[in-house]
Amino acid sequence: MMNSYEKFHLKEVINASGKMTILGVSKVSEAVLAAQRFGGEHFFEMSELSVQTGAFLANLLKAEDAQIVSSASAGIAQSVAALIGKGSLYHAYHPYTEKIEQREIVLPKGHNVDYGTPVEVMVAQGGGQVVEAGYANMCSPEHVEMMISEKTAAILYIKSHHTVQKSMLTVAEAAKVAQRHKVPLIVDAAAEEDLFKYTEAGADLVIYSGAKAIEGPSAGLVVGKKEYIDWVRLQGKGIGRAMKIGKDNILGFTQAVEEYLAHGSESGASMQERLKPFVEAINNLSELTAKIVQDGAGRDIYRASVKVDGRKTAKEVIQALKAKSPAIYTREYQANNGII
């Protein structure tokens, strides 16, 4: 039988980058595939499936409630819309109505990043208006506090390696500001590995990607306060209709969360051991110097960092690797500094 690479004339890819959206993120387990297959072969009352899988996951994650959505980006848009509409069916049908003025989403300036699309695009899709707090290189609780007004619908905090890491308030600090002003706090923790800490830190809604740390199918998860999750679920009658997720991925994702909580992700120590032979081999080559480095966002993730000091620049090496078949994809964020 012809495989998909042959059938669609696709280039094979070696993923040396990580769980990246542009490469299809991650591989799923046999149990997840079996759950997806069961979903694909059976019928359900979709509203019941949504509520019951959400309640099941909420119990596992020690949260009030949860809602599976199609992606973390959809989670941002629907969470923003939910906190603007506050359970109003009129709003769900008229998400951008001028009758509702409380639309401002306070976001640390260093968190207003492009992770494949700008954060503010997803906020705008939910009907929100970004109000930046602080500066590109710093944002304190006071910076966030001074931007809150009667038009504030929520505070949004992006926990990601894409964002500025230094001199930024913590999630716990953002939660204290939110609680003091009785404003909900949304935390986008798309690629984060800890499914408990942000709820415990005081976030009202926390968003995860289904296919990154959790290694499930394309999906997203919003966990948090029951009232707010009910409002998120209502968005299925509004903007969420364009972002709906299928029964197969709902069941596959739920299985992936169960497996993730049972087995966890690979430890940083294990990653370092796996990287050692690679780093040693690279260091035997001329014009390249490799070392093991920790993830820039402080997660227990380790990667090989390769410094290019030769006739070709890091950018040229990266492009040459991608041009081959199979294509080899690396992380390119430090290419300007000569690092792969």
Mark where each language-model region is.
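Conserved PLP-dependent catalytic core of the aminotransferase class-I/II
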Residues: 261-294
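Conserved PLP-enzyme active-site core in the AAT-like
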Residues: 2-23, 27-28, 54-261, 279-283
